[in-house]
């Protein structure tokens, strides 16, 4: 009898340092902190086993399949510099383990039960290499960067947005008024806050109607295409699609979804609906910090960003580097490139563990949002470049003269920065000077400069390599 019962070390089956990775494998880089006394090879192999074909004991049904064909393999382990008893374990998964076009299934395997595993004290997924063969099974973003620019007829600069505040408590009509004022003043977009769904003080249908009116009116008056991210997130997928259908009937350009609280299944359904019906899709990452903020456990945001590009979204919030929400510059730019570019080289200094080829999957616009104001504009323009959305909530609505002047101040600041950059000036060095010059001929900008000249929201960076 070939079957031998009992418990054997994972590393005998799942640690294979001689393995040559295939182009079709999904590759994962895990930061593993083993329990005291557990050797790194065993911990790495345990991760590979528990996230693929393994279980805690030998089972006779193993003989009914080819483990060699289907098992995950830990093929390389390296210590983490500056940390004791922490290792990066590289695991290769055969493509056959995953359902086509399902981020849900991919995550259920790779970041499922294994994170509660006793032999590992902590576990963090740092990066994933999605092979081209798997990428091709996803639709990806409904439209992507180029199509969005063509729909909006806006080129050569970042787009400007604003989250309507106070985020909860306004009636639909007052909310619509704030939307109109911001768009009329010069913003491209306004945004529902992520927690605005359909509450007693403002039901979704009323909000959609008043915001649509604000869009039509501001478009007619400015001659520019405007949008408001109508949050379609709901308690059920059916209700979510119902809201997206209503948005389409109002002929608005864009809807919004909270992809982590809503879930990848709902998000992918909405992305498919948006592509089929010409709606852009703005994605908010509420709940990401629950998953990505701990350095040694959870999942890095670059993995959540890659997963979103597969699942589908045209915009996603990606930190600011300069505002109230954290994000280290090089690391942030690493996953911003993973969102926008077609091909990204491995670069460990930016936290990118694998070369990623997106094979023409559309790109996603990164959104910088949270605690930013006119003085940040030169830095944001320089860091994020043209293909981005810069969102000023308090930085628009907090203007001493009101919402429309707040929008004017931001638009003037942005246009001044883009013009200066195109003339070859150094935004990093001359940023303050550029804003000061522009404020001489824009009283709205001058007032904004005065209000926010002393504001600093800076703490020690937490996301380090």
Curated annotation (Swiss-Prot):
GO terms for biological process: photorespiration; reductive pentose-phosphate cycle. It comes from the Eukaryota. Coiled coil: none annotated. The disulfide bond which can form in the large chain dimeric partners within the hexadecamer appears to be associated with oxidative stress and protein turnover. The keyword Plastid applies. Its main location: plastid. The modification N6,N6,N6-trimethyllysine is found at residue 4. It holds the Pfam family RuBisCO_large. It catalyses: 2 (2R)-3-phosphoglycerate + 2 H(+) = D-ribulose 1,5-bisphosphate + CO2 + H2O; D-ribulose 1,5-bisphosphate + O2 = 2-phosphoglycolate + (2R)-3-phosphoglycerate + 2 H(+). InterPro entries: RuBisCO, RuBisCo_large_chain_AS, RuBisCO_lsu_C, RuBisCO_lsu_C_sf, RuBisCO_lsu_fd_N, RuBisCO_lsu_N_sf, RuBisCO_lsuI. The record marks 324 as: Transition state stabilizer. The active site is at 165 (proton acceptor), 284 (proton acceptor). Heterohexadecamer of 8 large chains and 8 small chains; disulfide-linked. The disulfide link is formed within the large subunit homodimers. RuBisCO catalyzes two reactions: the carboxylation of D-ribulose 1,5-bisphosphate, the primary event in carbon dioxide fixation, as well as the oxidative fragmentation of the pentose substrate in the photorespiration process. Both reactions occur simultaneously and in competition at the same active site. This is Ribulose bisphosphate carboxylase large chain. It comes from Ulmus alata.
């Amino acid at each position: 009898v070939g079957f031998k019962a009992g418990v054997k070390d994972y590393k005998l089956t799942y640690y294979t340092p001689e393995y040559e990775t295939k182009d079709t494998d999904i590759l994962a880089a895990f930061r593993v902190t083993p329990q005291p006394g557990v050797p790194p090879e065993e911990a790495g192999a345990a991760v590979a086993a528990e996230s693929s074909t393994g279980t805690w004991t030998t089972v006779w049904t193993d003989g009914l399949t080819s483990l060699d064909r289907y098992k995950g393999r830990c093929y390389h382990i390296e210590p983490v510099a500056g940390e004791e008893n922490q290792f990066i374990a590289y695991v290769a998964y055969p493509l056959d383990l995953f359902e086509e076009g399902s981020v849900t299934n991919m995550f259920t395997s790779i970041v499922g039960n294994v994170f509660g595993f006793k032999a590992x004290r902590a576990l963090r997924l740092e990066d994933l290499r999605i092979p081209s063969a798997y990428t091709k099974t996803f639709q990806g973003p409904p439209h992507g960067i180029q199509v969005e620019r063509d729909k909006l007829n806006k080129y050569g600069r970042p787009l400007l947005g604003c989250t309507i505040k106070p985020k909860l408590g306004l009636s639909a009509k007052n909310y619509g008024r704030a939307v109109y004022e911001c768009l009329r003043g010069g913003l491209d977009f306004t945004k529902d806050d992520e927690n605005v769904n359909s509450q007693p003080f403002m039901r979704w249908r009323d909000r959609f109607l008043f915001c649509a009116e604000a869009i039509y009116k501001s478009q007619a008056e400015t001659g520019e295409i405007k949008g408001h991210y109508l949050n379609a997130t709901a308690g059920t997928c059916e209700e979510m699609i119902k809201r997206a259908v209503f948005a389409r009937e109002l002929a608005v350009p864009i809807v919004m979804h909270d992809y982590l609280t809503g879930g990848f299944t709902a998000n992918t359904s909405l992305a498919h609906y948006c592509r089929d019906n010409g709606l852009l899709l703005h994605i908010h990452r509420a709940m990401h910090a629950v998953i990505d903020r701990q350095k040694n456990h959870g999942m890095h945001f670059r993995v959540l960003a890659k997963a979103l590009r597969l699942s589908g979204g045209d915009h996603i919030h990606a930190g600011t580097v300069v505002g109230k929400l954290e994000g280290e510059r090089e690391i942030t730019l690493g996953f911003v490139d993973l969102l926008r570019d077609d091909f990204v080289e491995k670069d460990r200094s930016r936290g990118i563990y694998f070369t990623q080829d997106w094979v023409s999957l559309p790109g996603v616009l990164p959104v910088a949002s949270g605690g930013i104001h006119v003085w940040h504009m030169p830095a944001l323009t320089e860091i994020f470049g043209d293909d981005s959305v810069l969102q000023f909530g308090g930085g628009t609505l907090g203007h001493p003269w009101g919402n429309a002047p707040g929008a004017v101040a931001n638009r003037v600041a942005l246009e001044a920065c883009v013009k200066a950059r195109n003339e070859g000036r150094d935004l990093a060095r001359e940023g303050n000077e550029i804003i000061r010059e522009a404020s001489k001929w824009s009283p709205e900008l001058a007032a904004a400069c005065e209000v926010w000249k002393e504001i600093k929201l800076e703490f020690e960076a937490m996301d380090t390599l």
